[in-house]
């Protein structure tokens, strides 16, 4: 999945701190689904500002963990219940817009195929 969000240019550090908290929440979770989410979730920052001045961040999620909740705030609320209000305000103040969400199966995997056991033994 590719999920693109726009973040206010003066709030990129706050957004990245929020995402670091998400990483910490996923890493500390005893839920194997949450740990698998962390393993396949990266966030890329686009250096060139959007026409409106906001900064685009692309969440690259592969593989998507079936039935897992990727809601940033829910992950944070579950892990840091005492910080709910502060986390919400920080995220709200940084967030400008959801720009796009693309999901679907991989049509073509360009990664090299691993050698099969029989081919490796010859």
Residue ranges and their predicted role:
Residues 1-13:
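Immediate post-signal-peptide N-terminus of mature secreted/exported proteins
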Residues 9, 19-21, 47, 59-65:
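A mature extracytoplasmic/lumenal domain signature
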Residues 11-37:
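Short amphipathic alpha-helical segments
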Residues 14, 68-69:
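Extracytoplasmic/secreted cell-surface and envelope-processing proteins
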Residues 17-21, 71-83:
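Short amphipathic alpha-helices in soluble, non-transmembrane regions
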Residues 27-58, 66:
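Short, glycine- and small/hydrophobic-rich beta-strand elements in well-ordered beta-sheets
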Residues 30-34, 69-73, 85-89:
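Short, surface-exposed, polar/charged, turn-prone segments marking secondary-structure boundaries
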Residues 77-122:
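C-terminal partner/receptor-binding element of secreted or periplasmic proteins
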């Amino acid at each position: 999945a590719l999920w693109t969000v726009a973040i206010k240019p003066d709030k990129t550090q706050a957004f990245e701190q929020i995402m670091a908290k998400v990483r910490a929440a996923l890493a500390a979770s005893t839920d194997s689904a949450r740990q698998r989410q962390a393993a396949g979730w990266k966030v890329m920052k686009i250096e060139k500002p959007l026409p409106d001045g906001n900064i685009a961040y692309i969440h690259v999620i592969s593989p998507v963990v079936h039935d897992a909740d990727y809601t940033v705030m829910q992950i944070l609320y579950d892990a840091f219940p005492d910080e709910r209000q502060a986390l919400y305000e920080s995220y709200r103040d940084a967030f400008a817009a959801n720009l796009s969400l693309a999901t679907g199966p991989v049509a073509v995997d360009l990664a090299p195929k691993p050698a099969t056991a029989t081919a490796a033994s010859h």
